[in-house]
Swiss-Prot record:
It comes from Synechococcus sp. (strain CC9605). This is Cytochrome b6-f complex subunit 4. It is a multi-pass membrane protein. Gene3D superfamilies: plastocyanin oxidoreductase, Single helix bin. It is found in: Cellular thylakoid membrane. The 4 large subunits of the cytochrome b6-f complex are cytochrome b6, subunit IV (17 kDa polypeptide, PetD), cytochrome f and the Rieske protein, while the 4 small subunits are PetG, PetL, PetM and PetN. The complex functions as a dimer. Belongs to the cytochrome b family. PetD subfamily. One of its GO terms (cellular component) is plasma membrane-derived thylakoid membrane. Component of the cytochrome b6-f complex, which mediates electron transfer between photosystem II (PSII) and photosystem I (PSI), cyclic electron flow around PSI, and state transitions. Keywords: Electron transport, Membrane, Photosynthesis, Thylakoid, Transmembrane, Transmembrane helix, Transport.
Amino acid sequence: MHILKKPDLSDPKMRAKLAKGMGHNYYGEPAWPNDLLYIFPVVILGTIACVVGLAVLDPAMLADKADPFATPLEILPEWYLYPVFQILRVVPNKLLGIALQTLVPLGLMLVPFIESFNKFQNPFRRPVAMTVFLTGTLVTIYLGIGAALPIDKSLTLGLF
């Protein structure tokens, strides 16, 4: 594409326009109608064809029908709510579980004030922020894995 859109510098009129700074409008392939009428529909229709083709070749199978009289032993939330579910499931006092969940946003709001002395943007030169981030990430992963396990194995992740 770069070679096709290069201006012809042997043309004296083009060189004069380029010298005046007017060259970007006078050479190459115009956006209207070429891009908007020909290339964009091809890309859009190609994307739709890929999605429809994948849906036809590998359809998502429907699960069993819901049976209101056969409740599972433990109802799990969606995967992104596993850490919160694990906190509420493990902590004996539910009010304490809610209080622990409010500590997460409060802790995140305190990080800029704790590390206000550090002027670096590089994460490796900000040890407090990196420690808070890595600890929070590891605790979230730990709680998420534990929520998928039965309650008796959830704290040890079934390792002990």
